[in-house]
């Protein structure tokens, strides 16, 4: 595996980081299987070099202080490889650039393995283009329900949820959302992103019989070879 140039001088600060750089752990699947907590974004950079990122929201926050008005930027970002791994994070800083970088790092630390499949009774193709079953996620007043959709449906979702789902590698899904009204566009964007992420995270906790998982074509993480 070729190492991205910016990682050649990386000096890991955690045991997991050292194991990754020394080649003891070679895949992100091993990290999840062994229950490691990711504390360095470079670990994700090393194991998922094809990760992409997209800014979902940039918000300027002003606070009055005895020395005058202070301005900070709060940024929400989604990262993913469009094949079963996705993360959402927020960052704050006095300038937009550093806030974006902080949000990207936080999103990498929050990365999860997404369970995909074909749970629509209208389809039954057995490929991981959708989700295997209906699932709900919440954040604040926002609640989103993801429902399996047949192949070719696309992502029937709001713009924010759509971006998170795309980064996770989900191609077809129906959604139903409640809440978030009257809270302001920025707060709603953040909550919808986090609620969608919460729903995707909840997929992994549902227990299924092996034969049922096989029928639904369930894949956790990368679908390469599926």
From Swiss-Prot:
Q: Name one GO molecular function term.
A: rRNA binding
Q: Which GO terms describe its cellular component?
A: cytosolic small ribosomal subunit
What InterPro entries does the entry give? Answer: Ribosomal_Su5_D2-typ_SF, Ribosomal_uS5, Ribosomal_uS5_arc, Ribosomal_uS5_C, Ribosomal_uS5_euk/arc, Ribosomal_uS5_N, Ribosomal_uS5_N_CS, Ribsml_uS5_D2-typ_fold_subgr
Q: Which residues form the S5 DRBM domain?
A: 51-114
User: Does the entry feature the keyword Ribosomal protein, yes or no?
Assistant: yes
Instruction: Please give the positions of the paired cysteines in each disulfide bond.
Output: none
UniProt keyword terms in alphabetical order: Ribonucleoprotein, Ribosomal protein, RNA-binding, rRNA-binding
Extract the signal peptide range.
Answer: none
Q: Does the keyword Ribonucleoprotein apply?
A: yes
Mention one GO biological process in which this protein takes part, according to its record: translation
Looking up Pfam families in the UniProt record yields:
Ribosomal_S5 (PF00333), Ribosomal_S5_C (PF03719)
State whether it acts alone or in a complex, and with which partners, per the record.
Part of the 30S ribosomal subunit. Contacts protein S4.
Q: Which family does it belong to?
A: Belongs to the universal ribosomal protein uS5 family.
According to its UniProt entry, the function of this protein is described as:
With S4 and S12 plays an important role in translational accuracy.
PANTHER family reported for this sequence:
40S RIBOSOMAL PROTEIN S2, RIBOSOMAL S SUBUNIT
Q: What is known of its domains?
A: The N-terminal domain interacts with the head of the 30S subunit; the C-terminal domain interacts with the body and contacts protein S4. The interaction surface between S4 and S5 is involved in control of translational fidelity.
Name by which UniProt lists this protein: Small ribosomal subunit protein uS5
Source organism per UniProt: Methanopyrus kandleri (strain AV19 / DSM 6324 / JCM 9639 / NBRC 100938)
């Amino acid at each position: 595996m070729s190492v991205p140039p910016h990682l050649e001088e990386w000096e890991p600060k955690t045991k997991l980081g050292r194991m990754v750089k020394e080649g003891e752990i070679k895949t992100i699947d091993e990290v999840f299987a062994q229950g490691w907590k990711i504390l360095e974004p470079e670990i994700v950079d090393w194991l998922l070099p094809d990760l992409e990122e997209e800014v979902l929201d940039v918000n300027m926050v002003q606070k009055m202080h005895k020395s005058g008005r202070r301005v900070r930027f709060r940024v929400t970002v989604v990262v993913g490889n469009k094949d079963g791994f996705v993360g959402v994070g927020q960052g704050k800083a006095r300038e937009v650039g550093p806030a974006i970088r902080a949000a990207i790092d936080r999103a990498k630390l929050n990365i999860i393995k997404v369970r995909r499949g074909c749970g629509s009774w209208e389809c039954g193709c057995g490929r991981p283009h959708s989700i295997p079953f209906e699932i709900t996620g919440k954040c604040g007043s926002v609640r989103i329900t993801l429902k399996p959709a047949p192949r070719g449906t696309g992502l029937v979702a709001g713009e924010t949820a759509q971006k998170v789902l795309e980064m996770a590698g989900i191609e077809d899904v129906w959604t139903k959302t409640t809440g978030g009204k009257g809270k302001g566009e920025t707060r709603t964007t953040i909550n919808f992103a986090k609620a969608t992420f919460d729903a995707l995270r909840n997929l992994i906790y549902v227990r299924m019989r092996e034969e049922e998982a096989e029928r639904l074509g369930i894949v956790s993480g990368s679908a390469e070879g599926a």
